[in-house]
Amino acid sequence: MKSSSILILVFIIFGLISYYLYYNVFDLLYNHKIHPLIEDYKKNFNRKNRSIEKQVVWTYIEDPIFFDQDYYLQLLEKKKNVPILFNFCLQILNSKINKEFNDLIVISPNNIKHYLPDFPIEMNAQSKYSQKFRVDLLASFLLSKYGGLFVSPGTVVLKDLDEIMYNLKFKYDLITFGGSIRNVNSCNDKNHPGNYIIGAKHSNPTILGYKKRMLENLHNNGYVDKLVGEDLLSYSIIENKPDKYFHFNCEYTGNVDYRNHVISLDHYFGYRPLDFKNEENLIFISFPYDLILYDKKYGWFNNLSEKQFVEADTNISIIVSKEIYNIK
């Protein structure tokens, strides 16, 4: 009987020790080893670092306020009211990116706060600010924080972007394209580039200065000039004098013909043949997307079906349709 009592007591003591070890040692192990791993995973998951581990090509798209046709835009995985030109340009851009090394991230009013929680203005077609100013401000924020290549909506990409992305990673800190709209004969002037397409490393001083000036302009002016972004980028370039900086002139952006005359948007929407200065050099054709969307004389083009777009046979529809055909 005595030995039985001792055995029971041993079992009780063993149980108490096991209980202590389970709830204290395991708790210690959890707090020091397991919990930090879970928190780190949650942090990384919420940040979605997997989306920006590679170099990023950024672009933006939104529903125009006038548009009433529905098209399925696979890149955004939802129905969006996007004119066929912008839909096609997005598909073409996607096809020119080597996904092994680079990602395409399409910013929209629905996801902008995920990437830029501190973005200071409403980013949709109902905003009081012009689309051009809003997109320029967006580019300055994205490139300052993440770096990469920002391609404005409605840009036709004619060559793969491997070389540009490689040079941006290993050779240059800043890459610009084309000439400023406001400055005549600026095609070869790297101090006055266009700002429809910009490549930069994150935290680049020139882009940080550009962003700062854009914000100052936003806060100090009741009305924001839609072309002010180009001016402010130029001021920042002149002020910072970037060393590792490369500029592609207008031969690469479809802005000029062989006589060095600017190719107008009306010419692209017309039927008279285009005489590019050097067609083999073309990388992008960047269009003033805000004019295409909101100038009444181009309104007919925004309501074309895919079939009507191809059959329109204008210069712009021929160029875009050819690139789409190469994808499909």
Predicted regions and their residues:
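Small-residue hinge/turn detector
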Residues: 136-148
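Glycosyltransferase-associated regions of secretory-pathway enzymes
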Residues: 1-135, 153-328
